[in-house]
Amino acid sequence: MVLKVCVIGLGILGKQYVTRLDGRPEVNVVGVADVIEARAREVGHPVGAKVYTDYVPMLREQRPDIAVIATPDPLHREPVLAAIEAGTPAIFQEKPMATTVADAEAMLDAAEKAGARIFVNYANRGSPLDRATHYVIQHGLLGQIVYGESHLDDHIAVPTRLWGNRTRSWVEGSSTAHFLLSHSVDFLRWVMAPAEVTEVFAISQRKVLTYTPDLYDAFLTFDNGAKFRVKAEWIKHIDGLVEFSLDFSGAEGSLRYNKVAGFAEVEGWRANLSATLDYRELLKHQGALAAQGVPVGALYHHVDPLADVVERAAGKPRASLEAFNVAKDGWRVVNSFVDAVLEETLTPSSWAHYGPLPSGIDGLRQTQVVGAIVESSEQGRVVEV
């Protein structure tokens, strides 16, 4: 079976969708649409796709199996609804699902009524150490998670130069809440499932960029009592484009994940596991992760920060898992979307251990949480989700 695909929006990510999906033998990119015709020709001609400047006739003429929506953050609703109206059975959407809850609800409602399926590309679920984090928390290897932090920051070049002369207009329609915290919120919902965010308190500021907030800094409370701080800014003068780190504190262990390292940091991942685990159980979990394509080292060692003070190491050895500089896979989630369509399931064989793939329901939940973050920052109060 060969799946017919149409791609709407050919900016930075839209172009990548075309080349990545066209590289799969089960996929044929039959149409591409962008308001800039020259760009559509540049992207579409090399893969033999028909070029359009209007996605409505493209969807009607091509009748694709999959429509990819890679338009700017606030412009997802209309192409998604058009794809559903044209009878497209599967829609791959870039995150965030929407910048308003009303848009997300409208898309999900239309999909459910039509029997269409929406997939939302939360790419930060796909890399090996993303999946290792999910494994450790879902298997209770840290005990109950009680607190955590996520810092996801961009260089100031992103809101000032990334999209060329269109940058300001693009950024005015989004923010670090939608552009960055959509990643953080979804990642936390995924690893903490089935727990859900129930309330939010947030702040923001506009001191550097006047046309969009400089940052959002929020506290999320989950229904199991866990609390997380999530912070995202895009006014940093850093060496790289992105810095991304996550911390999880459990009742029995802790996890640190430097996904995209900053100055004087190393990209890596360490989980100090519950003291109840012995070395046999440690090796079992290491083997299970290896079988899933996640290479982590196993340590069974004394960890006592007071050893130099009291001149002795207390307690029994501690089980830990760690990894450094593991290659990322930013397209694993999208590839699993294709597998899901082929296998007609939300849990295809390529995503067997990580729960259902992110769908329109996840998109709505993420949009609700981010919407609460924005509302809380504007009103200066706790907002229930």
Give short role names for the model-derived ranges.
Residues 1-47:
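N-terminal Rossmann-like dinucleotide-binding module
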Residues 17, 50-110:
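Beta-loop-alpha module in the N-terminal Rossmann-like domain of NAD(P)-dependent dehydrogenases
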Residues 40, 79, 107, 133, ...:
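Aromatic/hydrophobic pocket-lining residues that form π-stacking "cages" and hydrophobic walls in ligand
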Residues 53, 69, 92-93, 118-120, ...:
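Hydrophobic residues in well-ordered beta-strands that form the structural core
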Residues 66-68, 310-385:
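C-terminal helix-rich "cap/oligomerization" subdomain common to oxidoreductases
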Residues 104-124, 144-148:
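Rossmann-fold dehydrogenase core element
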Residues 124-210, 227, 236, 380:
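Predominantly a Rossmann-like dinucleotide-binding segment in NAD(P)-dependent oxidoreductases
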Residues 179, 183-280, 285-295, 302, ...:
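Contiguous beta-strand/loop segments that form the cofactor/metal-binding neighborhood of enzyme cores
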